[in-house]
From Swiss-Prot:
Known role: Involved in the biosynthesis of 2-methyl-3-n-amyl-pyrrole (MAP), one of the terminal products involved in the biosynthesis of the red antibiotic prodigiosin (Pig). Catalyzes the transamination to the aldehyde group of 3-acetyloctanal, resulting in an aminoketone, which spontaneously cyclizes to yield the dihydro form of MAP (H2MAP).
GO biological process assignments: antibiotic biosynthetic process
UniProt enzyme class: transferase
InterPro entries on file: Aminotrans_3 (IPR005814), Aminotrans_3_PPA_site (IPR049704), Class-III_PLP-dep_AT (IPR050103), NAD(P)-bd_dom_sf (IPR036291), PyrdxlP-dep_Trfase (IPR015424), PyrdxlP-dep_Trfase_major (IPR015421), PyrdxlP-dep_Trfase_small (IPR015422)
Family, per entry: Belongs to the class-III pyridoxal-phosphate-dependent aminotransferase family.
Known pathway: Antibiotic biosynthesis; prodigiosin biosynthesis
Record keywords, A-Z: Aminotransferase, Antibiotic biosynthesis, Pyridoxal phosphate, Transferase
Protein's name in the database: Aminotransferase PigE
GO molecular function, one term: pyridoxal binding
Assembly, per entry: Homodimer.
The protein's required cofactors: pyridoxal 5'-phosphate
Knockout-associated phenotype: Cells lacking this gene show a white phenotype and produce 4-hydroxy-2,2'-bipyrrole-5-carbaldehyde (HBC), 4- methoxy-2,2'-bipyrrole-5-carbaldehyde (MBC) and 4-hydroxy-2,2'-bipyrrole-5-methanol (HBM).
Enzyme Commission number: 2.6.1.-
C-alpha cells in the first residue's frame, strides 16, 4: 500500500530549509535534463522524500511519498479557506502518484476542520495523525511520572491548548489515571460549562479552567501542550523541576532554542522513533531518517503497514480506543515513544531523575535555618554520603554539577567508567571488574594507586595528631624537611623551595620569580609546549586551542619554534626577555623528545645571554624517564625547577618551585617582600609527609631504574608491532613516558567524496561549484580539511575505545595532539603487564588494519 503525506514548515527557518531543498532539486534536474519552463513553475506542494519501500519490525511493507506545503502556520491561518482547497489539491496530486491514504500534518489538517471537511472532499481516506501524536505525548508523561516516582494525586498536570483534539484526548486519558488538571484554553472561551461538557462528569471536580498562563506557573510543574498558535509558555517562568512535554508543532514554549536553564526539562512530545528492525527505504552507512518522527506521519505509515484504507483521527473528539489501538500497532511495527528527546537531542532516564529533588521535599529541602542545620538538611547530606550510587547516578551527577561535556565525550567513546577501588596498577569498578591503568593520572601515580608505605606514613602522622596548616603562624616541620630533601636531590645548586598545590601553580610561582629577579617582563617558551591552564601558565603554553578563548593573555610572552636553536638565540638576545621556560620532553605536546644535545645547547645560550633557565619537570620528574629528573639526561642544571604530579605519589595535591638561593633572596629577601608570594594550602605538613614518603619509596624500590629498564623494553616491543602497520608513525618518548603517534591520513577524503557525488548525481554539479563565490569555496575547503583531520583523530580514539572495551586497558590522548596516545603507567608496572599491553595493542592494530597505505 502506498501513502502520501502533506507536511508544512513549522518555522521560518524550516520554510527556508524547504526552499533550499526545492531550489537544489530543481537545479539538479535542470543540470541533468536541460532547461524546461515547466520545471520553474509555481508548485502547490514541494517534493521532499520518497520511501520506495518501508519494512516494519513484523515484516509488513508499504511505500510512500512526503511533500511539503511551503507555508507556515500564520500564512495558513490568514487564508484558511484557500489553504483548505490547496490541501485537497495536494491530496489529488498524491493520489496521481499512487497514494491510497493521505496523512495531514499539522495545519494541513487543522484548516480542514481537523480533517473532517478535507475527508468529505478527498478521493482517498485521510488521517490527521493526532491519535498517535496523543498516544506518544501520553506515554511520555507516564514515563516521566514513573521516573520521578510521583503518584497522580501528588502533582497536578497543566494541559495547554484545551479543548483541541490532542489536549482533549490527553485530558480524558489523564483524568482516568487519577490526575488533577489545570486546563489552559483560549481567552475567547468564556462558557466554562461548555468547556467542561467535553469531559466525563465524574472527573470534573479535578479540573481547573483558566485562560491565563500566569495561573499555571505557581501551581504546576508538569505540563503537556498542543496548541495551534504556539509560543504560549515562557520557559523562564516555569518552576524549578518543571517538565514540559511540547506535543506536536508549533512549539508551545516561547523559544526556538533550548532555554538556558538546567533545572527544567523540555521534551519533544508526540514523536516516535523507529527501531533497528524497521527499514525506511534504502539505508546506507546507517544513515536514514528514523528518530523523532512526528506522530502524525508515523500514524500514516502504521495505517499503510496495516493496509487500512480508512479515515482516522478526524475531528475534535478522538476515540480513546483508537488512540490506544494505534499506539499498540505502532509499537508492534517497531515505532516507539522512547528514547525521549529535547530540542532533537536524546535525553535519558537519569536526566529526568535529577529533577526528583523538586518533588520529594521530605528528602530534599531548601528551607533556610540560621541557627542550626535543620533535620532535612542533615538528612540530605547524610543520604548523599551514605548512598551506594549506581554508575549512571554518578555519571549524571557529574553531568549536572561539574562538566556535562566531559561525561558526554566519554560516553561517546564508550569510556565512561566509574571506579570504586584502586590498587597498584589496577582500577576496579563497583562489580569488581579490573582495568590496567596506563595513564596513571597523567604521570601522578608513579608509585601505583594507594601505595601502602605512603598510606602508612599518612596514617601515622594523622594518628599522632600532627599539625597541618600552621605555616603562617609557625614553622612547619615536615615542609622544612621536604625542602631540604628536594634541594639535595635536584640538579644544580638549588637553595629555595616554594610549595603550592599543583603544577600550574608551580609554573605561576616561577613566572613571578623570573619577573621579580630579572626585572624583565618577557619570558620565552617553546611552540607546542604545555605548562598549565591558569592565566599565567596559559600565556606560555604553546598551543592555540588552549589559549584562543581567554585572550588577551599576559603580554611580553614570546613563542619560539621547538628545536630551532637560531630562533632561540635571537629571542634570548632581546633586552626584554629575562627567562626561558622549557620542558625536557613535551608531554602534552605529543611526547616530543628534543634532538640529542638540544637541551645542552639551550643551557649554553641561556648562560651567554644571562637568561634564567626554568625547567618544567611537572610531568617528567621523579623517575618517569629513567632519571630522577629528565634534564639530567643532558647534564642540565636549571636556575628554576618545577615539580608536582608524582611528588606525592598522586596521593595528595602538591607542587614545588625550586630555585637557586640567589634568585629567591633577591625578590623575596626583604622585610616588605618575604610574603609577597604565598599559598593558603601550600607547604602544609600533611602534604609534605606524603611527599617525603613518596621520594623515599621511589629510591627504595629503584623505580628510576625500573623506568629505564622496562621503558627501553616497552618502547622496542611497541616499535616492533608498529613496524607492521603504516598508520603508526612513531613510538616516541623515554623511559615509561611514551607516546604512540598515529598517522592514519584522510587527506583528500572529503574532497573526493564531494567530487564523487558531484559526478554521480544528476546534473553538472562541478560547474555549480565553479560559480560558488570565492569566500564560500574557501570556507568549504577549510571545513573539508578540518573534517579530514578530525577523521584521523577519530581513528586514534578508536584505539582508546577498543583497548578499554576489549582489553580492559585505560589509555588516553595527549592534550595538544589528538593523534597521540600517551603511555604513562605507574613506575611499579611489571614486565608481564607491559607484555599484556603490547599484545592488546597488536590485536587492536590488526583489527583496525582494513586500510593500509
Amino acid at each position: 500500500m502506498k501513502f502520501g503525506f502533506i507536511a508544512h514548515p513549522t518555522s521560518v527557518g524550516l520554510k527556508r530549509y524547504v526552499k533550499m531543498i526545492d531550489l537544489l532539486q530543481r537545479n539538479s534536474t535542470e543540470l541533468h535534463s536541460g532547461y524546461k519552463r515547466d520545471l520553474w513553475r509555481r508548485e502547490n506542494l514541494v517534493p521532499f522524500m520518497n520511501f520506495a519501500k518501508i519494512t516494519s519490525a513484523t515484516g509488513a511493507t508499504c511505500e510512500g511519498v512526503i511533500k511539503y506545503m511551503p507555508l507556515v502556520a500564520d500564512e495558513m491561518l490568514a487564508d484558511a479557506r484557500g489553504i483548505a482547497n490547496r490541501v485537497v489539491s495536494g491530496i489529488e496530486e498524491l493520489v496521481e502518484d499512487g497514494a491510497e491514504l493521505v496523512g495531514l500534518g499539522g495545519f494541513t489538517s487543522i484548516v480542514g476542520r481537523r480533517g473532517e471537511a478535507t475527508a468529505e472532499k478527498s478521493p482517498v481516506p485521510v488521517t490527521s495523525g493526532n491519535s498517535l501524536t496523543t498516544y506518544a505525548g501520553y506515554k511520555a508523561l507516564m514515563q516521566i511520572q514513573s521516573w520521578l516516582d510521583i503518584q497522580p494525586e501528588q502533582e497536578p498536570v497543566a494541559i495547554v491548548g484545551y479543548p483541541g483534539s490532542i489536549c482533549l484526548a490527553l485530558s480524558r486519558l489523564l483524568l482516568a489515571q487519577g490526575f488533577s488538571l489545570h486546563l489552559l484554553h483560549r481567552a475567547g472561551h468564556k462558557d466554562e460549562d461548555e468547556l467542561l461538557s467535553h469531559l466525563p462528569e465524574q472527573y470534573r471536580s479535578r479540573v481547573t479552567l483558566t485562560s491565563d498562563p500566569e495561573d499555571l506557573y505557581p501551581r504546576c510543574k508538569l505540563f503537556v501542550a498542543a496548541t495551534s498558535a504556539g509560543g504560549v509558555i515562557d520557559p523562564y517562568k516555569l518552576q524549578p523541576g518543571s517538565v514540559f512535554i511540547d506535543v506536536a508543532l508549533p512549539r508551545d514554549i516561547n523559544s526556538d532554542t533550548r532555554p538556558d536553564r538546567d533545572d527544567i526539562l523540555i521534551i519533544d512530545g508526540g514523536c516516535v522513533t523507529a527501531t533497528d528492525a524497521v527499514k525506511l527505504g534504502g539505508e546506507s552507512l546507517n544513515v536514514t531518517i528514523k528518530q523523532q518522527l512526528n506522530g502524525c506521519m508515523a500514524e500514516t505509515i502504521v495505517l499503510a503497514l496495516e493496509n487500512r484504507r480508512e479515515n482516522f483521527s478526524l475531528g475534535r473528539y478522538l476515540a480513546l480506543d483508537n488512540v490506544l489501538e494505534i499506539g499498540e500497532l505502532a509499537e508492534k511495527h517497531g515505532f516507539l515513544v522512547y528514547p525521549l528527546a529535547s530540542y532533537g537531542e536524546r535525553i535519558d532516564r537519569q536526566r529526568v531523575i535529577n529533577l526528583k529533588r523538586y518533588y520529594h521535599h521530605d528528602i530534599y529541602s531548601d528551607e533556610p535555618d540560621t541557627e542550626q542545620p535543620p533535620a532535612s538538611q542533615l538528612a540530605f547530606i547524610d543520604a548523599i554520603i551514605a548512598q551506594d550510587p549506581a554508575r549512571e547516578d554518578t555519571l549524571d551527577r557529574y553531568h549536572q554539577f561539574i562538566n556535562p561535556m566531559m561525561v558526554e565525550f566519554l560516553k561517546l567513546q564508550h569510556c565512561d567508567n566509574v571506579f570504586r577501588r584502586a590498587s597498584g596498577t589496577q582500577l576496579f569498578t563497583a562489580d569488581g571488574e579490573a582495568f590496567l591503568d596506563m595513564v596513571a593520572g597523567y604521570g601522578c601515580i608513579n608509585l601505583g594507586h594507594n601505595p601502602q608505605p605512603i598510606i602508612d606514613a599518612l596514617k601515622a602522622y594523622l594518628d599522632a595528631q600532627g599539625p597541618n596548616f600552621i605555616q603562617y603562624i609557625s614553622i612547619p616541620e615536615q615542609a622544612a624537611k621536604l625542602a631540604e630533601v628536594l634541594c639535595h636531590f635536584a640538579p644544580g645548586n638549588m637553595g629555595r623551595v616554594f610549595f603550592s598545590n599543583s603544577g600550574t601553580e608551580a609554573v605561576e610561582a616561577a613566572m613571578k620569580l623570573a619577573k621579580a629577579s630579572t626585572g624583565k617582563a618577557g619570558i620565552a617558551y617553546l611552540k607546542n609546549s604545555y605548562h598549565g591552564k591558569t592565566l599565567g601558565a596559559l600565556s606560555i603554553t604553546g598551543r592555540e586551542k588552549h589559549r584562543r578563548h581567554f585572550k588577551p593573555l599576559l603580554a611580553s610572552m614570546i613563542e619560539v619554534p621547538f628545536a630551532d636553536i637560531e630562533a632561540l638565540r635571537q629571542t634570548l638576545s632581546r633586552d626584554d626577555i629575562g627567562a626561558l621556560m622549557i620542558e625536557p620532553i613535551q608531554g602534552e605536546g605529543g611526547v616530543h623528545v628534543p634532538p640529542p644535545g638540544y637541551l645542552r645547547t639551550v643551557q649554553e645560550i641561556c648562560r651567554q645571554t644571562d637568561t634564567l633557565l626554568m625547567v618544567d619537570e611537572v610531568q617528567t620528574g621523579l623517575g618517569r624517564t629513567g632519571k630522577l629528573f629528565a634534564c639530567e639526561w643532558e647534564g642540565i642544571e636549571p636556575d628554576v625547577l618545577m615539580l608536582s604530579k608524582s611528588l606525592s605519589g598522586g596521593v595528595m595535591p602538591i607542587g614545588a618551585t625550586l630555585c637557586r638561593a640567589i634568585f629567591g633572596n633577591g625578590p623575596y629577601g626583604t622585610a616588605d617582600r618575604f610574603l609577597m608570594h604565598s599559598s593558603t594550602f601550600g607547604g602544609g605538613n600533611i602534604a609534605a609527609v606524603v611527599a617525603l614518603s613518596a621520594l623515599r619509596e621511589i629510591l627504595a624500590q629503584d623505580l628510576v631504574g625500573n623506568a629505564e629498564r622496562l621503558g627501553t623494553y616497552f618502547k622496542q616491543a611497541l616499535t616492533d608491532v608498529a613496524a607492521r602497520y603504516p598508520f603508526v608513525a612513531e613510538i616516541a618518548g623515554r623511559g615509561l613516558m611514551l607516546g604512540i603517534q598515529f598517522d592514519q591520513t584522510f587527506a583528500g577524503a572529503v574532497g573526493a567524496s564531494a567530487r564523487e557525488f558531484a559526478t554521480r548525481l544528476p546534473g553538472d554539479w562541478h560547474t555549480t561549484w565553479k560559480f560558488l563565490p570565492d569566500p564560500v569555496q574557501a570556507h568549504l575547503k577549510a571545513a573539508m580539511e578540518r573534517m579530514e583531520q578530525s577523521l584521523g583523530e577519530m581513528f586514534c580514539m578508536k584505539f582508546v575505545t577498543k583497548l578499554c572495551q576489549d582489553h580492559n586497558i585505560l589509555t588516553f590522548i595527549t592534550a595538544n595532539s589528538s593523534t597521540v596516545i600517551r603511555i604513562q603507567p605507574p613506575l611499579t608496572i611489571s614486565k608481564a603487564e607491559i607484555d599484556r599491553f603490547v599484545s592488546a595493542f597488536a590485536t587492536v592494530c590488526d583489527e583496525l588494519s582494513t586500510f593500509l597505505e
